[in-house]
Every structure is written in C-alpha cells, then in structure tokens.
Amino acid sequence: MKKIGMIIAVEFTPFKEAYGEPEEVVKDRGFEVSIYKKDRYSLYVISSGEGEVPASICTQYLIDKYNVEMILNYGVVGALSDKLGHALTCVVKEVVDYRFDTSAIDKIPVGKHPNLPLAIPTDENLRNKALEVVPLLEVRCASGDRFVDNPKEKEAINKEFGCDICEMEAAGILLTSLRNNVPALFIKVIADTLFGGANEYADKSQTAAKECTKILEHIMDTL
C-alpha cells in the first residue's frame, strides 16, 4: 500500500468535509497528522499553515516519521494573468522561488538557487499520471512568503518570471522533497484573479478549495 503525504496550508476544512473523519489523528510535538486508510493508499495529512518554512518543516516531518513515498500539495492560489479565471484547477509544472535573492554577492539571478534552474521542475511522472485522469492546465508557480494583492505587482511577477500563479508554500515543499529524493505533485485552484486580491481571496477561497477536493481522490487512486 502506497504512503502519500499531503501538505495543506489553510484549506483543511474543505478537505475534511470531502473526506470525512480520519481513522486516526496523531499529535506529536507541534505536529498533528490526520491518517486516512484507503484501498490503494494510506494518506497522511498535515496542515502546515502559511509560508515556505512551515510547509518545508511539515514535509520533512512526514518523510522522516512516516516514510511517505510522495508528497501531494493542494491549495488555493492567486492568478498572475487575466487568462486564468476563478476556480480553475491546475497542476504545477515548475516552481520559481521568486523572492530568493543572493544576487548582491554572487550575481546569480533573483529567484535562482545554486545548482538548480530558475524554474524548478516538479516530478514529471506524477504530473503525467494526474493529467491522465484530469486534463488540467500545466502552470508555472511563483512561490514566496508574501500575499500578493496588487494587480500591478502580479503582472510584474508574470512578466519577470513567466509565472501563471502565485502562492506561499510550493517552493519550500519542492526544495525539501528534492533534497530527500521524494517526488512531489502540486494541484492548485485559483481563488483570486489578476484584478482580485485579498477580498476576493477571502470571499472565494473556500469555494475554490472545495472544487479542488473533487479532483484529488481520482488523482490519488492513480499515483
């Protein structure tokens, strides 16, 4: 039986409404893991809270504690292009840690980690399996510890990094997964559009998350 680790930032309520009560809840130090047993897999779900660092810590915890074979992250995001509308569900092909910046000392471009491409690819095998189930749009994700509310800033990120969506956890999860040689898959759904912002996010994030959960189980059955 496969072991899947799932990192959820703040969208745990829609997930629980869709999946029901877990078979077991394990509290260990500052972590709380909800464990679901399915016919084809065991699912270890942890709510990390916002930000790259908490998401990275939770990723490492699931890998160390439960020996998960893959990491799945789902959640709501903001659109960086007017071509992407509310509640559009997508799969992340690449992640740019767009606020990472050591350029003053090493002349490496903003967003680029040493020994990695600027746009860090997610696991191709998991992406392809997900796409076999649902024909999702493949996107490039801008990840950084800041909620982007201003449409002009969104457009600037899109122009500089070629990113389609933005959020606050994917870079931390992906970098940690890569370090551990554990594949990661990211399924995202748009809450706030290009000209939306914090108000639209607050108003539509839970509805968008519910749409995303409808797709998750179909995908996980194939992983």
Regions found by a protein language model. Name each.
Residues 43-48, 140-142, 187:
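Active-site-proximal beta-strand elements of phosphoester/diester hydrolases
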Residues 1-60, 65-66:
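N-terminal short beta-loop-beta anion/metal-coordinating cradle
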Residues 69-72:
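Structural motif
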Residues 147-195, 199:
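A C-terminal functional module that forms or caps the active site or interfaces directly
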Residues 194-223:
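His/Asp/Glu-rich mid-to-C-terminal helical/loop segments that flank catalytic regions of hydrolases
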Residues 80-161:
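Mid-sequence, gly/pro-rich, charge-dense loop/helix-turn segments that line enzyme active sites
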Residues 18-24, 65, 85-96, 207:
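A glycine- and small-aliphatic-rich helix-loop capping segment at beta-alpha/alpha-beta transitions
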